[in-house]
Amino acid sequence: MIKFNTVNARSETVASAASYKAPWARGQRCIVPMEAFFEPNWETEKHVRRKFTRRDGEPIAVAGLWECWRGCGDQVIESYTLLTVNADDHPVMRRMHKPGQEKRMLALLDPAEYDQWLERPPADAFELLRQYPSELLLDEPAPKVAPEAPRSPEQLSLVDG
């Protein structure tokens, strides 16, 4: 069960990591839509926030895993994690994060892959976890915003609907 604040999961170990192996084996895959995601660029030795969107303006779809578990007082909590892939050699994402850190990027899906991601057997779904082509991403500076408050389990839970 995913019981910890595990926002991102390394795709390379998702089938064996204690927090993810059961949801992965059960095929509890999901697609997390978003308008954009943000990454820190340290090329100037200072944190410069970058905003990433799809170049065509369509929503971004991130490969994820979901899980239901019991919290305090038998409260049922639905949660998800975003899958990431290595990006050490990605033309754009290799510039993100601090020097010396492994470069990671979200595992983005194309619309034509949505059904495959949700329906393929777990062993076959790995094929879809790869670097997203840099020419399909738009990368721009993003203004600094006030820091977020710490995340609570309620903020990380799925919304019934």
Which role does the model predict for each range below?
Residues M1-G161:
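A structured binding-face within diverse protein domains that lines the active/interaction site
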